[in-house]
């Protein structure tokens, strides 16, 4: 998204960001002419935040929730300037894309591989899963493929209902056009499915990496 686009929605703020903003405003009122040492100020804010009770943090969390809702609402109607691509905004209420047969297979066998080879990196685990899937017989793949097909069928029904609910007038007007472009749309959605699955696997791997770091 364009850095200089004035119509671009302001990014959502976290509860801690709202807290720091409040601290900054308080500091300006008390010391209007004093310059702020950013690193020292940040350190003091961080220490103060750690000692605050959940009740005290509550108002900042409410502010963050309200700002998140504002951001999501504005992003739905935001159109980036021509020639500029924007990352697709994902509505949290939209039906989630179904996993592929391979993704279901990975979900089942990933914990087993990590248990047997605790020293393996995320990349090596993914590589091993790929090798296992390629060496799995077609008959053994069927349960995953059947489950994936059922989940995809359910998703298609859910997304159709979701889209119809969101744009009833557009759905009525575009019946003829939709029929013509149905095949193309399905192909695009299949490509999106693959992209989203890769994103989901990346996110899952990142989460696992963070968990490993915490341990």
UniProtKB/Swiss-Prot annotation:
CDD domains for this protein: HMG-box_HMGB_rpt1, HMG-box_HMGB_rpt2
Biased composition annotated in UniProt, kind: Acidic residues: 187-215
Entry membrane topology: Peripheral membrane protein
Binding site for heparin: 1-10
Region (LPS binding (delipidated)): 3-15
Keyword Oxidoreductase (UniProt): no
Keywords per UniProt: Acetylation, Adaptive immunity, ADP-ribosylation, Autophagy, Cell membrane, Chemotaxis, Chromosome, Cytoplasm, Disulfide bond, DNA damage, DNA recombination, DNA repair, DNA-binding, Endoplasmic reticulum, Endosome, Host-virus interaction, Immunity, Inflammatory response, Innate immunity, Isopeptide bond, Membrane, Nucleus, Oxidation, Phosphoprotein, Repeat, Secreted
Disulfide bonds: 23-45
Primary localization: nucleus
Organ and tissue specificity: Ubiquitous. Expressed in platelets.
GO CC list: alphav-beta3 integrin-HMGB1 complex; cell surface; condensed chromosome; early endosome; endoplasmic reticulum; endoplasmic reticulum-Golgi intermediate compartment; extracellular region; extracellular space
Gene Ontology BP term (one): V(D)J recombination
Chain intervals for the UniProt region annotation (Sufficient for interaction with HAVCR2): 1-97
Chain positions covered by the region annotation Cytokine-stimulating activity: 89-108
Listed result of changing residue 67 to A: Abolishes cleavage by CASP1 and impairs ability to antagonize apoptosis-induced immune tolerance
Phosphoserine carried by residues: 35, 100
Resulting phenotype, residue 35 to E: Cytoplasmic localization (phosphorylation mimicking)
Pfam families: HMG_box, HMG_box_2
LPS binding (Lipid A): annotated span: 80-96
Assembly with partners or alone: Interacts (fully reduced HMGB1) with CXCL12; probably in a 1:2 ratio involving two molecules of CXCL12, each interacting with one HMG box of HMGB1; inhibited by glycyrrhizin. Associates with the TLR4:LY96 receptor complex. Component of the RAG complex composed of core components RAG1 and RAG2, and associated component HMGB1 or HMGB2. Interacts (in cytoplasm upon starvation) with BECN1; inhibits the interaction of BECN1 and BCL2 leading to promotion of autophagy. Interacts with KPNA1; involved in nuclear import. Interacts with SREBF1, TLR2, TLR4, TLR9, PTPRZ1, APEX1, FEN1, POLB, TERT. (Microbial infection) Interacts with adenovirus protein pVII; this interaction immobilizes HMGB1 on chromatin, thus preventing its release from cell and subsequent inflammation activation.
Domain commentary: HMG box 2 mediates pro-inflammatory cytokine-stimulating activity and binding to TLR4. However, not involved in mediating immunogenic activity in the context of apoptosis-induced immune tolerance.
UniProt xrefs under PANTHER family: HIGH MOBILITY GROUP PROTEIN B1 (PTHR48112:SF35), HIGH MOBILITY GROUP PROTEIN DSP1 (PTHR48112)
Family: Belongs to the HMGB family.
Name this polypeptide is given: High mobility group protein B1
Organism: Homo sapiens
Lineage: Eukaryota, Metazoa, Chordata, Craniata, Vertebrata
């Amino acid at each position: 998204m364009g850095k200089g686009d004035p119509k671009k929605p302001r990014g959502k703020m976290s509860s801690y960001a709202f807290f720091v903003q409040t601290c900054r405003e308080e500091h300006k009122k008390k010391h209007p002419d004093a310059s702020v040492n950013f690193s020292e100020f940040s350190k003091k804010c961080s220490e103060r935040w750690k000692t605050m009770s959940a009740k005290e943090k509550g108002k900042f969390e409410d502010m963050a929730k309200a700002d998140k809702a504002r951001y999501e609402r504005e992003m739905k109607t935001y159109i980036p300037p021509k020639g500029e691509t924007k990352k697709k905004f994902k509505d949290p209420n939209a039906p989630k894309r179904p996993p592929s047969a391979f993704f279901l297979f990975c979900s089942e066998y990933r914990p087993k591989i990590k248990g047997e080879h605790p020293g393996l990196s995320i990349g090596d685990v993914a590589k091993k899963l790929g090798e296992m899937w390629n060496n799995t017989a077609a008959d053994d793949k069927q349960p995953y493929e059947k489950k994936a097909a059922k989940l995809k069928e359910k998703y298609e029904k859910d997304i159709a209902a979701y889209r119809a609910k969101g744009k009833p007038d557009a759905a009525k007007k575009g019946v003829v056009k939709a029929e013509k472009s149905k095949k193309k749309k399905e192909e695009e959605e299949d490509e999106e499915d693959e992209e989203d699955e890769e994103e989901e696997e990346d996110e899952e791997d990142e989460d696992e990496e963070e968990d490993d770091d915490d341990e």
